[in-house]
Design a protein with these regions (language model features):
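Nucleotide/phosphate-binding catalytic cleft detector across ATP-hydrolyzing
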Residues: 1-148, 156-276, 282-328
């Protein structure tokens, strides 16, 4: 299970059986969960006094233990109904940010166990991402992963089944979305919600002005902050690249810190092997080009960046006895 801030992905027998937004909706009158995943996401920021929508994870870790437990249980129940599974107890591998504290790790473990996990193992996200893109993490060779998720960006140098150097920062997809919301308010004087800002990021999100296949401008409707009248704005990729520049700079600084701390022999391996970009943030237009120019290394986007971590977690589940970097 890739228990992400933005999405939760579950893999069983090498197949993705669930890929849903990490959102749960509750009835305030009864306290019962009424929707999970996509259905709950559709209610997000659109509820009334009787309905409360929650994103249980923030910055890659559980922010609401009870909601997280309900969400995990609901998602397992969802795939059990779809596929006719009987799941009284499960062996699970769950990924967590490399910078997680003991308290945060315990919260993930407890939520997973309460949701039906009999045997729960943990794996750090960059290790799972490396496995998911086909890297032999047990080899005596240095590889570098930059995983830009919803809540955290994970940067790691991996060799001999361990993380040699790493950085885990909370500048990631959510912060980029907030940057766009702020930009629309400050430059265009319109208010947009999180879902609209996400759409802007998908349609015209970029971090480099000189890109191939530039996307068409994206039309956004919002409430004019001056008079609340509806207003239409055409947003282009260049202005989004400008508004995201500061946050991408923070990610670049974290990459630099990791490279500076990397032993010389492993650095030489990274020069030869390049750096793999995974996570939803890897899809920002021009990111690989910008980072390659900044560091003089070959940054390349993973073949399946959205699912690399989940795929690696599924492989780890099948190799529990061979991967001693898994832990409980």
């Amino acid at each position: 299970m890739d228990l992400g801030t933005a999405n939760t992905i579950i893999i069983k027998d090498d197949k993705i059986v669930l890929d849903e937004p990490s959102v749960a909706a509750f009835d305030n009158r009864t306290g019962e969960m009424i929707a999970v995943g996509t259905k709950a996401r559709e209610m997000y920021e659109k509820g009334n006094a009787n309905i409360r929508t929650i994103r249980p994870l923030r910055e890659g870790v559980i922010a609401d233990f009870d909601a997280a437990e309900h969400m995990i249980r609901g998602m397992i129940r969802m795939i059990s109904r779809r596929r006719g599974w009987f799941t009284p107890s499960l062996r699970m591998v769950v990924c967590i940010p490399s910078g997680s504290t003991e308290v945060e790790i315990r919260a993930v473990r407890d939520s997973s166990e309460h949701a039906g996990g009999r045997d729960v193992y943990m794996i750090y996200e960059p290790m799972a991402a490396a496995i998911g893109v086909g890297i032999d993490v047990l080899a005596p060779e240095g590889h570098m992963i930059v995983d830009i998720g919803g809540g955290t960006t994970e940067i790691a140098v991996i060799s001999l089944g361990g993380i040699v150097e790493d950085q885990s920062i909370d500048t990631a997809g959510d912060e980029l979305t907030q940057d766009i919301m702020d930009h629309m308010r400050e430059k265009h004087q319109i208010k947009v919600g999180e879902r609209t800002a996400e759409q802007i990021k998908i349609q015209v999100g970029a971090v480099y002005a000189d890109i191939d296949d530039a996307p068409a401008d994206f039309t956004v409707w919002g409430a004019n902050m001056m008079d609340t009248m509806p207003r239409k704005v055409e947003v282009n990729y260049r202005e989004i690249a400008e508004c995201l520049d500061n946050s991408i700079g923070k990610i670049e600084s974290a990459i630099l810190r990791t490279l500076e701390a990397t032993p010389p022999e492993l650095y030489a391996d990274i020069v030869a092997n390049g750096v793999v970009l995974t996570g939803g943030g890897a899809l920002l237009r021009g990111l690989d080009k910008r980072l390659s120019k900044r560091f003089g290394l070959d940054f390349k986007i993973a073949e399946n960046p959205l699912h690399s971590v989940a795929i690696g977690t599924g492989i780890a589940l099948k190799n529990i006895h061979n991967f001693n970097f898994l832990f409980r």
